[in-house]
Amino acid sequence: MAASAAAAGEGMEPRALQYEQTLMYGRYTQELGAFAKEEAARIRLGGPEPWKGPPSPRVPPELLEYGQSRCAPCCICSVRCHKFLVSRVGEDWIFLVLLGLLMALVSWAMDYAIAVCLQAQQWMSQGLNTNILLQYLAWVTYPVVLITFSAGFTQILAPQAVGSGIPEMKTILRGVVLKEYLTLKTFVAKVIGLTCALGSGMPLGKEGPFVHIASMCASLLSKFLSLFGGIYENESRNTEMLAAACAVGVGCCFAAPIGGVLFSIEVTSTFFAVRNYWRGFFSATFSAFIFRVLAVWNRDEETITALFKTRFRLDFPFDLQELPAFAVIGIASGFGGALFVYLNRKIVQVMRKQKTINRFLMRKRLLFPALVTLLISTLTFPPGFGQFMAGQLSQKETLVTLFDNRTWVHQGLVEEQEPPSTSQAWNPPRANVFLTLVIFILMKFWMSALATTIPVPCGAFMPVFVIGAAFGRLVGESMAAWFPDGIHTDGSTYRIVPGGYAVVGAAALAGAVTHTVSTAVIVFELTGQIAHILPVMIAVILANAVAQSLQPSLYDSIIRIKKLPYLPELGWGRHQQYRVRVEDIMVRDVPYVALNCTFRDLRLALHRTKGRMLALVESSESMILLGSIERSQVVTLLGAQLSAARRRQHIQERRKAQMSPPSDQDGLPSPESSVHFQVNTEDSAFIPARGETHKPLKPALKRGPSNASKAGETSTGSMESAGIALRSLFCGSPPPEATSDLEKPESCERRKLKRVRISLANDADLEGEMSPEEILEWEEQQLNEPVNFSDCKIDPAPFQLVERTSLHKTHTIFSLLGVDHAYVTSIGRLIGIVTLKELRKAIEGSVTAQGVKVRPPLASFRDSATSSSDTETTEVHALWGPHSCHGLPRDGSPSDSDDKCQ
């Protein structure tokens, strides 16, 4: 015995991961991950257990036939290289490197194509400057053709590619499945459509669409790498890669990896997993590096520099007395950002409310983008009105001139003289710098708000960024005009740098529109200087404080316009929201099905709601929540019960009963009683009559000591059957030893019935055996039979809340876990449901919506007397009562809750 015990101990040593005791903590000599992989490989290949002897060599059967072919060494070599790379480098590193490389190539190629398109427009305009009419036609026709092609190509190939893409990614990362948003055709439509849209010269952006493009690239790359196996076969892993891809999209767009990571976190996530932090930084940094290296390779740059490099003085970038001016820029940008979001949303709402115009434009889908492009191109025509708003400059050229550190209005020094091209753009003959900047800001403001509504792939970050830079430049030029000799400090004179004000304004307005602070970091990486870090941070924070109190962010506004599932943030300064509880906002008339219900009850529950999930309770009296069941499962159950196969089975059984000879009927009941006996047997076994035969519930047979003793236990039989059915739903199949002698005759009888079911006629003959009245009567009989949920996929632990949960905690739970609904229970009893719809209305202040029984927010306060132990004990006993009230039904129709759980 001792020897066997020692042998057993030695045999179990590998099972214990070869643990050895050390000085302090002890350690395992075998990694847990390696051990798990070896065990998984052994189980998959069916090899012997390592502690039961040395494993015998085994050759996979698929390699036996081609073991001596030429492809075998190549396959073996590729597998070994893949394993070496995965083991030495890691799958995450390989994926992130490929993602960064692909996105850098796409970004550089797109910028190259956009630059070619813009140069072609300038070449056409300058080549026809002798004829003003032809020059106007060329200036207007070129962007109209590109925008029309972009809109048509996107609508035909993938309408999901329209717009920014950040609102959709924010919804997807929250757990909502949006079809066709991460497919290959959407990727192609987004890339080509965005290139044409930006090449037209319209005030559109690139950053938002590139977040969507990077996410699609990550999704497609995950599917490709899953062909070789590995962790990317798991779909839940893709969410982490999408979070990193959002950072890559911003990083390769502006060559700003740090700001890209922070910006992607702010605009797409409410709660961010820190484990994805390094993935975003690594991939975004690699992508930005390749993006700038390609610019050097194409000889666009001499070395790797910032995208909009500035040359502000570093010894004294700004004076302390200039901080109030920077604060004014931040506050004004906050109001401007809120106004931009409001104007963008109002344009869409006005177009939707005009039914006649909307129907006409829906039939002529390309007319609206063509008209908008024609209007904007006409206003920006350089010889016309465009000369007063620098219409001949592209967005990149505009930013370069606005970030210039030289003063435009002060012409006292030689080094402050502007180049001729810039002087002609911002100093037209019949206007000055201030008038040009004011017209530029006003015109670009509403043009950008209108252009972002065009159904093409486009963003709004870059136009807003340019408008903010122009506003900051206007303030800077005004300060330079008011203090022409600069601000005197301790006998030293430091002239004002208007370019620094432009940097502050760009970051402030972009942060106000997007509700982000990371725009400050993006500005530092774009300019390559951090000299104005304090003014930029002050302006961005003030702009966010003002904008967040007035309007949602641009992306949240688009989410509301598109009616995507979302959960708004709890606004600051609204203390009454923290006093609302779940019982004040929950829907009390919850659609549910009982464990002992009939198929008629299932049909009624399906007619009452269109929700995706239905609550499963023990009974209508107890309302004990057992789980949740999908609507598709209920539809399948009901369809199988009333299917044509069951009707044919019923006809077969009736014909067999009629055609049986009298000699075979000796000692057997009549056909009518035989059919009635089969139906009663199925009811007592709680098994739906389907085409196939199900095993009876074995625990139900073991509970009673004898069949004769069940006659006087009617009251306790229902309670026992509920527990038996509950165990059969959430437990696996019973062990073989649970089979008793009492179930053998029934199983034998079922086997006999199965053997005699022989088809005697074809389907057409069987269908003609029953009249419509008989079919209707048969369906009514089937609807009265009890339901067996044994074959349904039931969630035994749906998410639950208690009625005293606060709104703040509920919002945190919904945001953190990504759930779309939660059942409200009190000591296990279902009393209500809370979905995103109710939670959203409670946060936005419209909690008195139709169909939702809502108590006032202050009604949730309890006096000190009601919090005593006696009162709570009384409430607990009242909840356990068999006839306690579960809440009043809603005043609205049952269809009011149709959109819950969506």
UniProtKB/Swiss-Prot annotation:
A motif (Selectivity filter part_1) lies at residues 163-167. A motif (Selectivity filter part_3) lies at residues 459-463. Residues 166-173, 241-253, 257-265, 499-513, 514-515, 516-527, 528-532 dip into the membrane without crossing it. Keywords: CBS domain, Cell membrane, Cell projection, Chloride, Chloride channel, Ion channel, Ion transport, Membrane, Phosphoprotein, Postsynaptic cell membrane, Repeat, Synapse, Transmembrane, Transmembrane helix, Transport, Voltage-gated channel. PROSITE patterns: CBS. Residues 671-683, 706-719 have a biased composition (Polar residues). Common gate kinetics are down-regulated by intracellular ATP. Inhibited by AK-42, a derivative of meclofenamate. Inhibited by Cd(2+). Inhibited by Zn(2+) and PKC activation. Inhibited at acidic pH. CCLN2:HEPACAM channel conductance is up-regulated upon hypo-osmolarity. It is a multi-pass membrane protein. GO terms for cellular component: axon; basolateral plasma membrane; chloride channel complex; dendritic spine membrane; plasma membrane; postsynaptic membrane. Pfam families: Voltage_CLC. Residues 38-51 are annotated as: Modulates channel gating by both voltage and cell volume. It is found in: Cell membrane; Basolateral cell membrane; Cell projection, Dendritic spine membrane; Cell projection, Axon. The chain crosses the membrane at residues 90-123, 132-157, 182-200, 207-225, 277-297, 323-351, 360-379, 431-451, 459-482, 533-550. The record marks E207 as: Protopore gate. SUPFAM superfamilies: CBS-domain pair, Clc chloride channel. It catalyses: chloride(in) = chloride(out); thiocyanate(in) = thiocyanate(out); bromide(in) = bromide(out); nitrate(in) = nitrate(out). The record marks H532 as: Couples extracellular acidification to the channel closure. A motif (Basolateral membrane sorting) lies at residues 816-817. Residues 18-36 are annotated as: Essential for channel gating by both voltage and cell volume. InterPro entries: CBS_dom_sf, Cl-channel-2, Cl-channel_core, Cl_channel_volt-gated, ClC. Residues 1-89, 551-902 are cytoplasmic. Belongs to the chloride channel (TC 2.A.49) family. ClC-2/CLCN2 subfamily. Homodimer. Interacts with auxiliary subunit HEPACAM. Voltage-gated and osmosensitive chloride channel. Forms a homodimeric channel where each subunit has its own ion conduction pathway. Conducts double-barreled currents controlled by two types of gates, two fast glutamate gates that control each subunit independently and a slow common gate that opens and shuts off both subunits simultaneously. Displays inward rectification currents activated upon membrane hyperpolarization and extracellular hypotonicity. Contributes to chloride conductance involved in neuron excitability. This is Chloride channel protein 2. It comes from Cavia porcellus.
